[in-house]
């Protein structure tokens, strides 16, 4: 990083009241600031108890000051942490004192961004910080910690090292074109490429599982009015999150709920009827429902077996994207017998279900996990993001193209290897555009 980097400060603990509140400061040569804050010269990595004072020497609070000298800190710069009482007024006064002493307010994720830019973390590890904070289940937290501790990064670095080794082998032959084929055959370049492809496939499979655990499955409930969509949402959520009445059209807006199935987040939207209406409020809800449908991975199509697919249901089905996966739900199975087979909704799976008794809910949950592609938490998994999966798919594609190169296409072979390396490097931040970094770190919380 440049030497002209400003000192930054932020509250590092959650907003609101608490037993302890933490102010984090990062920059260069922070000892004078530490002395101004507490009237003492702190020793690195030693907790110093002191009064934190304002510009007039009046105590704002008392607590612990921790000083971490560069480069042995989270950000790689000098870092100060003030641990005081966790009231919002006290935290605000302490933060303002830091700003008076020359710091500026940190942007979201700026501490972690500095850690990345100072080579304390790679990009996958930095994302692991945010994913650990945002984890929605114990499984997600465990896998995010693995990413933060470098499990994912080590797999990627191993791929990159093997790619570099193979590239050096292939590119060296370009200087001796008359011997290239024999040289590559003797070095088993094709065998090494096959091994690389298998390794990428393995990391990709793990990354896809990690992405499922982080990002989950988007599900929409669709069907004719009063067919039981809201009742099913309540049954899945285990709570009254949607109003249930016998009046058709009760749901005038999309109702959203997140549930966990074996640690996998499932984002469910109970759609307002996908129909035309003159009601302004209902029309807004229908537009939101259409947006939810466009973003969905799976549609649960609710059908009353006594009526089958009526005109209203058919109109809803026609409004669904043809490629959207569908599960046909025969609702209210406690009131009538389950109809054999489906009703031509385009679904491969049909489940009879009663939201009232719970019959069929477990079968539906298992089906949703299968649709998500979740295979269960196993050894070697780590939390991953869609961008990681896409980068690994790009590397996989480049290696497949390299495998198609003939014996006299050495330059093309080498280029595909280079592009595969670039794709892998995007995961750890070795090859990453500044605008992508801005997007990634802007989604962190302030103070991290």
Curated annotation (Swiss-Prot):
Give the Enzyme Commission number.
3.6.-.-
> Where is this protein found?
Cytoplasm
- SUPFAM superfamilies linked to this entry: P-loop containing nucleoside triphosphate hydrolases, TrmE connector domain
Superkingdom of origin = Bacteria
**A Gene Ontology cellular-component term:** cytosol
Known cofactor(s):
K(+)
The answer to whether keyword Flavoprotein applies is no
Protein keywords: Cytoplasm, GTP-binding, Hydrolase, Magnesium, Metal-binding, Nucleotide-binding, Potassium, tRNA processing
Binding positions (Mg(2+)): 230, 251
Q: Where does (6S)-5-formyl-5,6,7,8-tetrahydrofolate bind?
A: 24, 81, 120, 448
Q: Which residues bind GTP?
A: 226-231, 245-251, 270-273
Gene Ontology MF terms in the entry: GTP binding; GTPase activity; metal ion binding
Q: Which HAMAP family match?
A: GTPase_MnmE
Function comment: Exhibits a very high intrinsic GTPase hydrolysis rate. Involved in the addition of a carboxymethylaminomethyl (cmnm) group at the wobble position (U34) of certain tRNAs, forming tRNA-cmnm(5)s(2)U34.
- Quaternary form? Homodimer. Heterotetramer of two MnmE and two MnmG subunits.
What is the name of this protein?
tRNA modification GTPase MnmE
